[in-house]
């Protein structure tokens, strides 16, 4: 995926695998956890969360990221391990999340 972060969306893409691994470890993510990820961007954190066995509900506003993430995580989406929502997390009604448990 070759697109740069949109500062208007407040984007900052994660790149350092060590940082992402440390984040997942610090959050004590274990298999069976359900994680809400705001702005998965390029899917770096998403990938680590899925590898840890978590189910991920990823809410992405950027139109450019949706096709990329849909293709990158096609198998996880088909298996129900990843739910990719095209929405603005700041306007998303958290009550709608209950349908994904």
What name fits each language-model region?
Residues 1-101:
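Catalytic cores of RNA-modifying enzymes
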């Amino acid at each position: 995926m070759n697109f740069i972060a949109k500062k208007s969306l407040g984007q900052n893409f994660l790149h350092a695998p060590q940082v992402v691994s440390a984040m997942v470890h610090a959050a004590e993510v274990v298999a069976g956890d359900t994680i809400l990820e705001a702005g998965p961007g390029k899917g770096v954190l998403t990938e680590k969360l899925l590898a840890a066995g978590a189910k991920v509900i990823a809410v992405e506003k950027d139109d450019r990221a949706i096709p990329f993430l849909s293709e990158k995580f096609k198998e996880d989406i088909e298996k129900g391990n990843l739910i990719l929502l095209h929405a603005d997390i700041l306007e998303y009604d958290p009550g709608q999340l209950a349908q994904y448990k």
